[in-house]
Amino acid sequence: MTNIRKTHPLIKIINHSFIDLPTPSNISAWWNFGSLLGICLIIQIVTGLFLAMHYTSDTSTAFSSVTHICRDVNYGWLIRYLHANGASMFFICLFIHIGRGIYYGSYLYSETWNIGIILLFTTMATAFMGYVLPWGQMSFWGATVITNLLSAIPYIGTNLVEWIWGGFSVDKATLTRFFAFHFILPFIIAALAMVHLLFLHETGSNNPLGLISDSDKIPFHPYYTIKDLLGLCLLILLLLLLVLFSPDLLGDPSNYTPANPLSTPPHIKPEWYFLFAYAILRSIPNKLGGVLALVASILILAIFPLLHTAKQRSMTFRPLSQCLFWILVADLITLTWIGGQPVEHPFIIIGQLASILYFIIILILMPITSMIENKMLKW
């Protein structure tokens, strides 16, 4: 009798995806983050489900319901902080996963890459709407500022913003619909992740050398299941350190003040994982220009396959491109720092220079450097 693992219609799919999957023998720890993102998504859906059982999406009770979860529900504080800090871990894994894709040229699998960009946008939308739900000061003002950006769209902008708000300001209708969307989107993310995996398995995984590895493949299980398990242990350790020792480290203190439309916080800023984009938005002294730069800063990922001028896929043997890549990483860290600072000298000019550098590195310096390296190969 043939193994049920290989014959059963459903188990067969799981087998081909996670057990008998032929995998390059040399993929490094940077390839762990895909599975970690899957784990993060599961953690977020499970903790989110338990939070939704006790949360009320009404402006008069939302803030109190979060307090009730933390004080009265059994281990409610744990569930709430696992969910909040789980989002931070999610984005750390996401940024490393994208960085790995850029470094090793994984973006040349264009279908997988494009689904990944859609996943990034969907995850960012979900996180933004989730941040509004506790209905603290930063929730309310963050929602007001970010949704207001849509009013920069010519002709339809104002109508669009009022349609999203469900009124003339962020209010009950906005909170209710944000809760509904925040609940449904993670399941859409899960479906998209399956499509992402489907496209990846059409081509097989890339590897650190950027070479075709068909001649040297090993089964995913047990080699990479045990490796992913180590990554999972480290992820859980980091998450628990954060949750149990300093759960509010990455949050904003003003979100412990109930939302008040009559008093604006001195510095409105989003969660840390949006600060780089927020800094780019703020560095342009024009509303529409800022919004376009904000969208472009993420959408620029879509043209990476077109900007690939190198003869080698991976940056492993391209030292000049490696230097540029790490300058880009440093630039993004600088933008993240600037996004959390007040709009005053010298932060304004630093933010503007970092924003310009971000686009120059990706659009101009990286393709030119690759061409120079191509020439150096001929020497």
Curated annotation (Swiss-Prot):
A ubiquinone binds at H201. Binds 2 heme b groups non-covalently. Heme b b566 binds at H97, H196. Its main location: mitochondrion. GO terms for biological process: mitochondrial electron transport, ubiquinol to cytochrome c. Heme 1 (or BL or b562) is low-potential and absorbs at about 562 nm, and heme 2 (or BH or b566) is high-potential and absorbs at about 566 nm. Belongs to the cytochrome b family. The cytochrome bc1 complex contains 11 subunits: 3 respiratory subunits (MT-CYB, CYC1 and UQCRFS1), 2 core proteins (UQCRC1 and UQCRC2) and 6 low-molecular weight proteins (UQCRH/QCR6, UQCRB/QCR7, UQCRQ/QCR8, UQCR10/QCR9, UQCR11/QCR10 and a cleavage product of UQCRFS1). This cytochrome bc1 complex then forms a dimer. Component of the ubiquinol-cytochrome c reductase complex (complex III or cytochrome b-c1 complex) that is part of the mitochondrial respiratory chain. The b-c1 complex mediates electron transfer from ubiquinol to cytochrome c. Contributes to the generation of a proton gradient across the mitochondrial membrane that is then used for ATP synthesis. This is Cytochrome b. The gene is MT-CYB.
